[in-house]
Amino acid sequence: MQNTGHSYSSGKWLVRPGSEQEFIERWTSFIEWTLNEAPGAVSFVLVRSTEEPSKFLSLGAWESQQAQEAWREMPQMQVMLGHCRALCDEYDTYRYTLAARLGR
């Protein structure tokens, strides 16, 4: 993931056992929609726990906090998010700003 965004979004997902593959497909569709329809969306990753395969963490980079907030207010965003959440027992979301950047 490029660290070009000035704002970051994350999701902590606990997917119902047996629904993991469908969740990955729905999340991918949600993020493809986001990248096509939400100005300022930069890049996203979804990682999965190796110890508990029903736990996922998503991280998205945004050009600005305003772009992220505009996306959150889009009616279709709530619909697409709902498709993912329907497969989860727990979901939390967070907003972040860049604190440090390292890399090669």
Predicted regions span which residues?
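Short, well-ordered beta-strand segments in beta-rich or mixed alpha/beta enzyme
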Residues: 6-14, 43-72
